From Swiss-Prot:
Family: Belongs to the sodium:solute symporter (SSF) (TC 2.A.21) family.
Keywords: Glycoprotein, Membrane, Transmembrane, Transmembrane helix, Transport
Record-linked Pfam families: SSF
Coiled-coil stretches noted in the UniProt entry, renumbered to this chain: none
GO terms assigned for molecular function: putrescine transmembrane transporter activity; spermidine transmembrane transporter activity; urea transmembrane transporter activity
One GO term describing the cellular component: plasma membrane
InterPro entries xrefs: DUR, Na/Glc_symporter_sf, Na/solute_symporter
Transmembrane segments: 15-35, 57-77, 88-108, 134-154, 167-187, 195-215, 256-276, 296-316, 343-363, 396-416, 428-448, 454-474, 496-516, 589-609, 624-644
Glycosylation: residue positions: N390, N584
Location(s) in or outside the cell: Membrane
Reaction equations catalysed: spermidine(in) = spermidine(out)
Protein name, entry field: Spermidine transporter DUR3
Role played: Major spermidine uptake transporter that is also used by salivary gland-secreted histatin 5 (Hst 5) to enter into candidal cells. A major component of host nonimmune defense systems is salivary histatins, a family of small (3-4 kDa), histidine-rich, cationic proteins secreted by major salivary glands in humans and higher primates. Hst 5 is the most potent of the 12 histatin family members and has fungicidal activity against blastoconidial and filamentous forms of Candida albicans. Hst 5 cojugates to spermidine to be uptaken by DUR3.
Amino acid sequence: MADSYVPLPQSAGYAVVVGLGFVFAFGMMLTTYILRRYNKEVMTAEEFATAGRSVKTGLIAACIVSSWTWSATLNGSTSQVYNNGVCGSIFYAMGATVQITLFACLAIKARERAPAAHTYLEIVKGRYGTTTHFVYIFWGIVTNILVTSMLLSGGSATVNDLTGMNIVAAILLLPLGVVIYTLFGGIKATFLTDYAHTVVLIVIIFIFAFTTWATSSKLGSPQAVWEIVTKLAESNPREGNAGGSYFTMHSRSGGMFFVINIIGNFGTVFLDNGYFNKAFAANPSSTYKGYIFGSLAWCAIPALCSLTMGFAALALEHTEYWPLGRPMTAAEVASGLVLPNAASALLGKAGAVLALLMVFMAVTSAMSAELIAVSTIATYDIYRTYINPNASGKKLIWVSHLSTVIFAYTMAGFAIGLYYAKVSMGYLYEMMGVIIGGAVLSSALTILSKRQNWHAATFSPIISTALAIMAWLVCTKKKFGSVTYLKTFEDDAMLTGNCVALLTPFIIVPILTFIFKPQNFDWKLLDQRITRVDEEEELAEALGGTVSSDPERLHPIKSQISVIASQLVEGEREQYQKEKEILNKSFKICCIVCCTLAICLVVLFPMPLYGTKYIFSKKFFTGWVVVFIIWLFYSAFQVIIFPIWESRTDLYHTFRGIYWDLTGQTYKLKAWQNEHPEEMHAVRSQLQAQLSRTAVTHEIVDGKAFGDGYVTPANIDDALEEKKG
C-alpha cells in the first residue's frame, strides 16, 4: 500500500491519532470531575495506583481484554492466518489465552498475601530483600519496554500504511492523548477508557465478520471463501501444511509458532506489573473471576479477527480489489500489514477507517496499562522504597506523573530507533520470550511457594536468560550459517531460545533450593513490610481543609472521610473477615478451573486436529466460523453489558445527581451524600484501608510475625547481611 495506494489522506491519520486522542483525554477529565462530584472519588496516590481496590468483575474482565489486545494481537494473528491458514487463528488465540487464565491463580494469591501491595515487586522486596528486588525490577521494566515497543511499532506501521502519515510523527503522537488521560485519572482512567475501547473494538470486528462471511458481494459466505482459498492452495500449496492446505491445523510453522507464542506470552503476563495492578485494584471476590472471564472473552477477539481478515486477504489478494495490486512482501507481512490491506480490499475507504480506529484503540488502551505499570514501579519500588520512604501522597502522585511522561517519550524514542533499524513488530513478538521467559517460574513461586529460597529467586532469571540467548544464537549459527537479523528470526532459532528460557528454571530453581536449603517464609510478614500510603493530607485538602497534629492526643487529626469510615468499621468487620476466608477457599477452586481450561485450550481442543492432519471440509469450515461468531457474542456480553449491570446502582446514583444539578436541586444531592456516606467511593476506600490495618496489628509483635512456629526476621536485608557475615 505504501508504494502504490494509500486509501486515506494524511489528515485522517492526524485526526485519529491526535484528535481522537484528545477526545479521550477530555472525556477522562470530564469523567474525573463527575466521579469526584457525585461519587466522592478523591485522586490520592492510592487511588491513582489502585482505584480504591474495589473494581468489580465485569470491568476487570473488560480491562483484561483491552490490555491484552495489542496491535500485535490484531495484526500479528492476522499475519499468522495469512501465512499458515486456519491454524494461525487458533494457535495465536489459544496460545495467548492460557497465560491469562493461569494468572488468575497468581492474582488471587497476590491479593490475599499482600493486600496493601501496589506492585508484585513489593512482594519480591518484602520477601527477598534489595538485591533480588533489583533483579526483578530489571525484568519487569524490560517486559514493559518490549510490550510498549511492539505497540508503537505495530501501531505506527499501520497508521502509515493506511494514511501515509510519517511513521516518526505517528510514534511521537500516539502516546500524547494516552499520557494526558492517564495523568488525570490514573488506573481508573485506564479502566474506563479500556471499557470504551473494547466496545469499539468488538463492534468493528463484528462489522468485518458479518461483511466477510455474510453480506459482501466480493466474498459473502464461508463456502465462497473456502472455494477461493482451496483453489489458491492447489496452485500455491502452503509448505509444511498437511496437503499444502490452508484449512488444516497440521502446520509445521504454525506448530512452532504455537510453542513460541505460549512461552513468550507467559513472560508478558507474569512479569508485566500491569496485570498485577488490576489484581490489586479488584474487589477481593472479583480478582480471579475477572481474569478467568476476561481470558475467555479475549480468546474470541484474535480468533475471529484473524480468521476473518486473514482469509479475506488470501481470497482477495489476487483480485482487482486488492489495494496493492501485487502480493505482499515478507517484510510487509512481518510488519503486520495484512489486516489493513484486507480491510481496504473488503470495504474500501470505510474498511481503512475501521482498521485505523481498531488499531488505534488497541495501541492506546494497552499502552495506558503499560504507563501505569511503569509509573507504579518507579513510584513504589524505586522512589518510596529507596529515595523517600516517608513521601507524602502528593509527592508520590508527582513522581507517578513524572515517570509516566518520561517512560512514554523514552519509549517513543526507542521505537523510532527500532524503525530506522528495520526491526519489525513480529520480530519483537517472537524474541520477547527469549529475553524475559527465564524469570517467569521464579517470580510465580515468589508468590505461590514459601519454600523457594533467596538463591533460586535471585540467580535463576540471570542464568536462564543467559543460556536462552546463547542457545538462540548458537542454533542460528549452526543451522543457518551466520547470525543476522533475518537468520535469528527463523522459526527453529526462535523456538530454541524460547524453550530454553522458560524451561531452564524448572531445573535451576530446584537445584539451588536443594543446595542452599528451602526457605520457610511467613506470609504474614508481608502485611508489615508492604503498607498503604497515608491519604489523610490528600483527603483533607480535597474537602477544603488541612491536616495538622493534636499535641495533646499525639496523633494526627483525621479527615472527615476517615472519621466517617472509622464509625463504619465495626459494622463491616465481619463481612471483611468473610471476604478473606472466601479468597482463601477460592484458590483451590480457581486452580482446578484454570488448569482444566488451560489443558482444554492447549491440548484437548487443538491437538487432535493437529495430530489427525484433518483438512476442513466446506461444511466443517462453515461451522468453525459460526462457533467463533457466537463466541464473540459471549465476549460482547461479558465485557460490554455485564460491567454496566454490575455498576447499575452507582450509575443510577451518578445520573440522578447530574439530573439534580441540571434542574437546580443540588441541595438534594448534598443531603443524600450526607445521609448515605457509606455509598461514597472515598469512604469505602478508607473503610477498606482501616479494616486492612486493624486486621494485621495483632499479628505483629516486636517487628516479627508469628505463623506456624517458624519466625522469619522482620528485615530480610539485615538477615541476609548477617548470614553473609
